[in-house]
Structure formats: C-alpha cells, structure tokens
C-alpha cells in the first residue's frame, strides 16, 4: 500500500518541527497485518508555511503569473528553499524508517511535472543560462545553433538570454526545444536529489517514482535507469473506444523504459476519476481486464488510487476501493477482492 505521498504538512507542521507519531502507528499497524508499504517522501506538495516564508519558492508561468498554494506542486523547480526543506524531510524519513520491516520501497515525490513542469522566474532563468553555457560553451556556438540572426536576436552576453517567456509573436523554436530539454533535466535533478539521500541511508530499499505514460515534459528514457523500479500511473477513459489500445501502448512503453524488467502499475482507478468533463465509471469487468492487460505487458504489481474515498479536498469524488460510507458491500470492492484472490 502507498502512504504518505501528500503528508508533508502533517509530517512537518512547522519548519523543522517533525511529527512522525501517527506514521509510526500506521507503519506498525500495516506490518502487523501483513501489509508492506510503498512509502512516499511527501515532497510533491509543500505545506503552506514554505510559500509563506519563501514566496520566491513559488512557480511562475511564461506570462509572469505566480502560481499560489491551494492545489499541489506549488514550487519552483530551482528553488533553494524548496530543495533544502525537501532534502531535510527525506533525510528524516529515511533515518526514521530505515529499519522498519514494513518498508518495501520508496516512492519519491509524485508524478513529477504533472502540474508544474517548468518555471519562468528569474532563478530559473539563471539556471537556464548555466545549462546553456554547459551545453554550448560559447555564445557564438549558441547563436549558430539557435539561428539568432533571424529577427535580429543575436546574443552578445549570456545575461541577455531568457526563458521563452510570452513574446509579441512566435518564439524561436530552437530556444523552446532547449528550454524543454532544460526543464526535463531539472525535473530529473530533483528526483536525483531525493534518490541520492535514500540510497545513502537505505541502500537496500529500492526507489521509484510514478511515470505518466506519454508525458512529454519529462524525458523518461533518460530518467528510467536512475530508478530501481519503473512505475506507471494510467487512467484510460472508459468511454473512449480506443482506450484499450492506448493503454496497451503506454504499458509497452513502460516495460521498454525498464529494459524489459518488471514494472509497477502504481496508480489506476477502480471505478471513475473526478477530473474529466465526463467521469464515466468502468463497466463491470473492465478494471480486471485493464489490470490483466498491464500484467500481460510485464507489470508484476497492480495497485490503485485510492484506498478510501476522501471526505474532502480536490479529489473527494475520485473513485476508490472503499466509498465514503465505508462499506465493503459494493461492486467495486467485490471486483477488486476477486482480482486480488486471482493474482495470489
């Protein structure tokens, strides 16, 4: 079972004040009942105190608009304040649970880049220039590669270069391509930051993060070998006649990313999602069919989001194994239980 993924504000209610007592009880309870844990590092959603104390840690769009807390992933990919706080939390978690018998695998962050895959703030701009210098070495080479003679965009100093922010008309496509490469590398660097901490403290515990199929902002081919296990979140639309084929392709891609090694289906819904214009329920047997499809394409783990429907929050209407009322007398529960027994 996956736990702790969005628990930062409970694990660290105030800067440097950690409270793991509730997680201790949960880890012990799960182990006592024969359940092993995919433990999230909780870094995907910083608590409000981070932005309150470090407003420059918030991401900025190409239009110059700051994205404020209230959802998730409200952090700049290059914020030193975010990285310092995230590293400290991951270190404390690893030191606390390194010997816990329930710990089976680490789940770093969550769906990197899903909502914020790039940031256009001044800190990110400086990081972009550094990345470009390491890539090209000289301004002459950068000007040649970018074709900056067109529209009189030749650069004479590195400081003149900015991210492809909103401009009067079409941006330079080569600049945009390098920006996307840079942003992907920035996401990977955040993953490396957490992975290095965990491998230092818990070298025998595998590390993973959940990829999202054909997600373009991150170069999964470059990223996958950094993880011990490749994991996938997949949410095909039950109302789409082509969903089964698309899901098959996503599963095949995930297997190839791990060079044929077994991979984890970390997230799928047991019934319906809550974020489409039309949130169609899976038909009877469809959850089993798509789970078996993943297994046939190399997965050795089938998991779900989420265990019990949330009582509040942005995903309170998302499907779950157990509904709000808490009963196990439902078609979804019976189908998931049957699948579990079948896979045993």
Question: Model features per residue range: what roles?
Answer:
Residues 27-34, 95-101, 220-225, 253-260:
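Acidic (Asp/Glu)-rich catalytic clusters
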Residues 53-55, 60-229, 233-247:
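Polysaccharide-binding and catalytic clefts of secreted carbohydrate-active enzymes
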Residues 6-21, 49-80, 170-176, 276-279, ...:
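Surface-exposed, active-site-proximal loop segments in enzymatic domains
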Residues 158-162, 200, 204, 213, ...:
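Carbohydrate-binding surfaces of carbohydrate-active enzymes
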Residues 2-7, 40-49, 104-113, 211-216, ...:
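Short, solvent-exposed turn/loop segments enriched in Gly/Ser/Thr/Pro and often Arg
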Residues 2, 34-38, 102-107, 206-208, ...:
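Structural preference for beta-strand elements that scaffold enzyme active sites
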Residues 8-21, 48, 114, 212-219, ...:
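Acidic-and-aromatic substrate-binding clefts and catalytic sites of carbohydrate-active enzymes
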Residues 2-67, 91-94, 191-201:
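Aromatic-lined substrate-binding rim segments of carbohydrate-active enzymes
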């Amino acid at each position: 079972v996956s736990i702790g993924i969005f628990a930062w504000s409970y694990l660290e209610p105030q800067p440097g004040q950690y409270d793991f007592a509730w997680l201790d009880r949960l880890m012990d309870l799960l182990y006592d009942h024969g359940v092993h844990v995919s433990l999230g590092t909780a870094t995907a959603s910083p608590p409000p105190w981070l932005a309150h104390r470090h407003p420059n840690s918030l991401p900025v769009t190409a239009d110059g608009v700051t994205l404020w807390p209230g959802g998730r992933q409200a952090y700049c990919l290059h914020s030193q304040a975010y990285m310092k706080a995230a590293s400290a939390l991951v270190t404390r978690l690893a030191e606390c649970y390194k010997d816990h018998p329930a710990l089976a695998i680490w789940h770093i962050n969550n769906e990197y880049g899903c909502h914020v895959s790039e940031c256009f703030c001044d800190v990110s701009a400086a990081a972009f220039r550094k990345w470009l210098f390491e890539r090209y070495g000289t301004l002459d080479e950068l000007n040649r590669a970018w074709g900056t003679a067109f529209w009189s965009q030749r650069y004479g100093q590195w400081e003149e270069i900015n991210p492809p922010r909103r401009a009067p008309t079409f941006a330079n496509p080569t600049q945009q391509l390098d920006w996307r490469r840079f942003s992907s590398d920035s996401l990977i660097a955040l993953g490396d930051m957490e992975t290095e901490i965990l491998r230092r403290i818990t070298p025998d515990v595998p590390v993973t993060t959940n990829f999202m199929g054909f997600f373009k902002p991150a170069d999964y081919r470059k990223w996958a070998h950094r993880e011990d296990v490749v994991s996938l979140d997949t949410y095909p639309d039950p109302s789409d006649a082509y969903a089964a084929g698309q899901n098959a392709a996503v599963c095949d891609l995930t297997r190839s990313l791990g060079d044929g090694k077994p991979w984890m289906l970390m997230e799928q819904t047991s019934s319906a999602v809550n974020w489409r214009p039309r949130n169609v329920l899976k038909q009877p047997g469809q959850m089993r069919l798509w789970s078996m499809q993943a297994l046939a394409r190399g997965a050795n783990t089938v998991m779900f989001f989420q265990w019990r429907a949330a009582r509040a929050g942005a995903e309170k209407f998302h499907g779950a194994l157990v509904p709000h009322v808490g009963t196990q007398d439902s078609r979804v529960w019976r189908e998931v239980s049957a699948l579990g027994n079948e896979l045993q």
